Amino acid sequence: MSADEEILAHYGLTSLSQDYWTEKPDFAIANASVDVQSPTTGVHHERNRSEDILRTGGATSETTKDASAAGPVTPSFAMKRSQTSVQPSMSSQIAIGGMRNPMATRKIAGTYRDAPDNSMQQTSTGVHRSSSWLTTDGTHQLLSLMETNFNKFIAAKETIDNVYAQIISTLSHAGPAKTMDMCEESISGALQQLQLFNTESTNEVDISYGELLVMRECEALFTYPEKFRLYHKQEKYSLLMQEIENAKKLYEKDRERLAKVNPKLVYLVDHAWEIIQATIDGICASIWNQILQSQGDFAFVVRTLCDLLKLKPNPISGRDPVLYATVSQQKYLYNLMKERFSYFEKIIKSRQEDFSKLSCTRASPMLVWRAVARGCNLDYTLRGRPEVFAGMQLIEWANACVLKIVREIKEVELYAKEFISGIQQASYPEAAKHYGRDPKQMGVVVEKLNSQCLEMVYSFVGERGERLEMDGAFVLIQLHYFQRVADLLPKRIRTVFSMAATRCIVDTWMLQHAPQSKSANIEEMFIVDANENQVLEPELMVVDVLRELNKLYIPPHREEIVREIHHAFYKVLYANARFPSMSVSMANWESDVWSLASSTLIDFVQHRNQHDMKKLASKMTTSLPVFSTSITRSDVLHFVTRLLNLRSRLVPYQKFLLQTFPLNEVSPSLDPRISKSLRNLQDLYKLLAIRDTSFSNTTPSSISKLSIQPPTFQLFSTLETIYLELKDSMPPNEAADWMIATTSCMLAQFALHSPYAFFHDIPSISHFLNKCLPPTILDLLQQIQRKAEASSISPTTETATKTRLKFQFIEMIFS
């Protein structure tokens, strides 16, 4: 076997190439097959083998007497690195319990310190001289290999020695914290460099490795902060607390042990514990920031707060963390309220503005009323209409805005009650069990949340429900959707919403069914809905509105709102019970006609002045009002029927109003209003009866010997038709009153347009219409008859034809 192969076999190497070894990183060298089972057998064996190799080359190394006495010859580069690595040494300050041979350690350290400069120069000279005696390339390669490994060992050892020397020299001046801050990075790098040594046998190395042992013992404490941060990141707070307990036990154990060995080393352990405490404080601060920044998840806040107090019972310097966390949630919820309410205010305002620019067909009030009365689904009945969209938008506001906030507040309120009762503090450390137990402070936070929510709702809906207006939707539609929204809301918020919604309904009710312009024009009273060809009579829906309002605005009622409801009730009925009067009074017109009949007409008939009679009749007719729209007697009778029904229902309506919305005030009376409206309608009916009848004019030559003239018979036929209309449309008393008034007016019209027939048939008319005319008109007819007789106008005296006339009105029976 050659010399190279013997070297390779002895050291377990595969190659003597220097490039192979020097290009490898430190961890590769650490894992090499060189015998490094212990620092003693590794380092000192390297030194002895280097001397053997030198001697096998046949060279005689020149060494000093002091150096040869201290031990084997050390190469000059090793001595030089050793001298720099042991200033100052720990041999005079530290005695490590694990060191078995302190005398040998001091001897080795003394050798490094006492080696003179001339011996180092001689050794260096011997090494260079022996290099020329080497006979093989393997020898050069092995020396280079040994120098490389030994240089790495010396570099790592030198770092540890220098760092620890700096620690020892500055502990008493700068303190452990500042010193360790300066040296931790260097220590970490040195520990990585020394991974090639077996840590189990470190205590057998010289005094510099005693220093390393101390640092490794402290390293366990310095690794805890990283574990703490990892557990905090993973939110494994139970493991974190367990590791904190382990760190505390290790700290107490190491501190007690090192205090016995060397009290100065306690500074190092104390500093490690200070770093641990600072890490814990940082983690607690981070957890507290998470609690303050959490938004809406109060369950997370409570759970995290429990973990925080277990780590640090006093996280915010004596103040109540439970109270502060609750206040933080209160601030978040308030911001959430402002954000959500502002969003819905914006979209509702946009919808109202857009709708005002559009012309949409409104839902028929009659259709809605029938749907409500029959319990139909308005969403389906009104599908596709803007009223449904507006109503569903309010329902979305209740669900996505109000109810979401209320649920958050309820959660805070529930946890606040549990904190006040001490349920949540059961798992808290003893020093933190008093947190959150003040009912006044915790109650103030919850009450403030509720009051803020109420203020937001009040501001949103408006004092009179301005935000709730559904683009002029029919009052029953608004009531339907307002009721659906109110059913979703909790009690206190429902009260605020209901008051505003009730005022909005009251305003809409009066606006739609009691407009100020409704009483200005008679023709407007008879406008018919072109779509449905029906008119919803407001008095029909009074009970429906009151019933729905009673569901919407539940007790306790505020007096001013109840007064507004009463005001709207009477205003709607008052407006619909009012019928305007005409510009000309039919009573005055009739009186003028009878005055003419008793004077001027007699003269005209006596002198047969037909031209003046026609002129007078035209003048009296044109003095009556003319309507641009077609109004019939049946329309008037329908309106009369409504008023009569309203008068008959008024007392039940008033009782229902007082039952649903009690008010200790005297109810106004509508009887005078209804009576006046009926008189105005009666005048209109008389006017229409005159307009609808055209009497044929007669001349003296056309007067026949018959007892009843044709125009007189036409008058009786018209009165028969009117009698039947009134009998079917009114109660007996009202029908009789209207029949008498209409007969008198028709007779005046008859006298104006057919004076010859009138004067000829006065006796028959007085006899036949005895029950159909008021006493004043009967007396007036007798006076006219006497004047006619005095003027040589001979009226007929035939009355036997009464039995042959089959007119029902003559008897005036309406029952």
From Swiss-Prot:
GO terms for cellular component: cell division site; cell tip; exocyst. The keyword Thylakoid does not apply. It is found in: Cytoplasm. The keyword Nucleus does not apply. Signal peptide: none annotated. Disulfide bonds: none annotated. One of its GO terms (biological process) is protein transport. Residues 43-54 have a biased composition (Basic and acidic residues). InterPro entries: EXOC2/Sec5, EXOC2/Sec5_N_dom. Residues 37-74 are annotated as: Disordered. The modification Phosphoserine is found at S50. Keywords: Cytoplasm, Exocytosis, Phosphoprotein, Protein transport, Transport. Its main location: cytoplasm. Belongs to the SEC5 family. Component of the exocyst complex involved in the docking of exocytic vesicles with fusion sites on the plasma membrane. Component of the exocyst complex. This is Exocyst complex component sec5. It comes from Schizosaccharomyces pombe (strain 972 / ATCC 24843). The gene is sec5.
